[in-house]
Regions:
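Conserved C-terminal helix/tail region of periplasmic/extracytoplasmic solute-binding proteins
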Residues: 215, 319-386
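Paired acidic/hydrophobic, glycine-rich loop segments that form the ligand-binding mouth/hinge
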Residues: 70-73, 206-207, 223-228, 243-244
C-alpha cells in the first residue's frame, strides 16, 4: 500500500508518485536517473515510486480510497474525469515556474481548461507495431489487420499472433476508427456496434495486453499489436525487425499524459516541487530520451539525442497530427456501459445475451444444486428414522 508523508516541507518528507510502468528515466544506458537527481537537488524530499498499467487500474485504486498519493500521471481523458469527480487539487503555479516552458499547443486543453489541475508530462500517438520478419508490409494498411484482414476484407495468416489492448477506451477507439465513429461518441447503438466488431476480433487475438506487450513483441511470441509510439521505439531498440504504422486515413488517438495532484495528497508543496523539476527543459529532455515519448517542452529537444526515426515517429507534421483525435472524459453511465461491453467481449460472454444473464444462469444452477442437496438431506434423515 502507498504510504503517507509529513506535510512539513522543512522536515524530511516522502512523496508517493504513481505513474505508468517504464515511464521515467532510471539511469540505464547512460541516461539520467530522474528520481536520484531530484533527491540530490532536494535532500529533504524522498520519492516512493509506484506504477500502474492502465488509466482504469489507476482510477480503481484511487477511487477505492485508503491510500495516499501525491503525484499521478494519467492520460488526458482521465484527468478530465478525475477533475469532474472532485479527485484532483488545483495546482499552485507559484511552485511550478517551469510550466512556462510548456508549448502553446498543450496549454488550455479541452480536458483541463486553463490547466487548473494538470501540467503535460508527455504526448504521443497510438499505432500498429508489427514484425517485418513475419508480417508482409503490404498487409499493414490500417486497423483491419488487427482482425487478421487486409483492406479488401480478405483473411490473412496472422491469427493467434495478434495482441489487443486490455483496456476499454483504447480498444473501443480502434473499433470506432474502423467504423468511422467518433472516439468520443456516447451513442449506445454505436458503442454496441463497436463491441460487436471487437467480438468478431476475439478468435484471432492471442492475448489482451498492456505492459506484457514488451516481452511478447521483443521475443517474437506475437507479431502484431496496437500500442503507443514511444513504447515502439523502446521495443525496436531490443528487436530491430519491429516497425510502426500510423493509420492516418482511418484516424488514431493523439494523447497527452499529464501530472496532477490528487485530493489524497499529504504534501502538495513537495509534490509541486517534483512536477516543477520534471518541467525543467534539461531534465525533461534527458527523461524523454530514455522513455522515448514526445515532450511538450520544445526547449527540451536541444538536450535530446533524436535520430531520424525518433523524429519522424514522435514528432509527425502538424497536418498529420490533425488526423488524430484526443479522448474526452465520458459521462459515468457511458463509461460503465463501455466497460461492461468490453468485459463481456474479452471474457467471451456473448453480446446476444441480456446483460447480467450469465449471472442469472449461475444463480439458477446454484439454486438447483441447493435444492437437490436439500432433498437428498431430507431423504437421508427419513432413512435414518426408519
Amino acid at each position: 500500500m502507498l504510504s503517507g508523508c509529513s506535510a512539513q516541507q522543512d522536515e524530511q518528507v516522502t512523496i508517493n508518485v504513481y505513474n505508468w510502468g517504464q515511464y521515467i528515466s532510471e539511469g540505464d544506458d547512460g541516461c539520467i536517473d530522474v528520481i536520484a537527481e531530484f533527491e540530490a537537488a532536494y535532500p529533504n524530499i524522498k520519492v516512493n515510486y509506484v506504477t500502474f498499467d492502465s488509466n482504469e487500474t489507476m482510477y480503481t485504486k484511487m477511487a477505492g480510497g485508503g491510500i495516499t498519493v501525491d503525484v499521478i500521471i494519467p492520460s488526458d481523458y482521465m484527468v478530465g474525469r478525475l477533475a469532474q469527480e472532485g479527485m484532483l487539487l488545483p495546482l499552485n503555479f507559484e511552485n511550478i515556474p517551469n510550466a512556462q516552458f510548456v508549448d502553446q499547443r498543450f496549454q488550455n486543453p479541452s480536458y483541463d481548461p486553463e490547466n487548473k489541475y494538470s501540467v503535460p508530462y508527455s504526448w504521443g500517438t497510438v499505432g500498429i507495431i508489427y514484425n517485418t520478419k513475419y508480417v508482409d508490409e503490404e498487409d499493414v494498411t490500417g486497423w483491419e489487420i488487427l482482425w487478421n484482414e487486409n483492406a479488401a476484407g480478405e483473411q490473412l495468416d496472422y491469427a493467434g499472433k495478434i495482441l489487443m489492448f486490455d483496456n476499454s477506451r483504447d480498444a473501443f477507439a480502434i473499433a470506432q476508427c474502423r467504423l468511422g465513429y467518433s472516439m468520443n461518441t456516447t451513442d449506445e447503438q454505436e458503442l454496441l456496434e463497436c463491441a460487436k466488431l471487437l467480438e468478431q476480433q476475439r478468435p484471432v487475438v492471442q492475448q489482451y495486453i498492456m505492459d506484457q506487450v514488451f516481452d511478447l513483441m521483443e521475443n517474437e511470441e506475437a507479431w502484431i499489436a496496437p500500442y503507443y509510439a514511444g513504447d515502439y521505439l523502446t521495443m525496436s531498440g531490443e528487436n530491430e525487425d519491429l516497425a510502426f504504422y500510423l493509420p492516418g486515413d482511418q484516424g488514431f488517438n493523439l494523447f497527452v499524459d499529464a501530472m496532477c495532484i490528487p485530493t489524497c495528497c499529504e504534501n502538495q508543496e513537495a509534490a509541486e516541487t517534483f512536477i516543477n523539476f520534471l518541467c525543467d527543459p534539461e531534465i525533461a529532455g534527458g527523461n524523454m530520451d530514455w522513455i522515448c515519448y514526445s515532450t511538450p517542452i520544445s526547449a527540451a529537444k536541444e538536450f535530446m539525442e533524436l535520430d531520424e526515426e525518433m523524429e519522424s515517429i514522435n514528432y509527425p507534421s502538424g497536418d498529420f497530427l490533425d488526423k488524430g483525435t484526443s479522448y474526452l472524459p465520458m459521462p459515468r453511465e457511458t463509461t460503465r456501459y463501455v466497460d461492461n461491453l468490453f468485459m463481456r467481449v474479452r471474457n467471451g460472454i456473448s453480446l446476444e445475451k441480456e446483460p447480467g444473464s450469465e449471472v442469472l444462469v449461475w444463480a439458477a444452477v446454484i439454486v438447483a444444486v441447493a435444492a437437490i442437496a436439500g432433498a437428498a438431506f431430507l431423504l437421508l434423515r427419513k432413512r435414518k428414522k426408519k
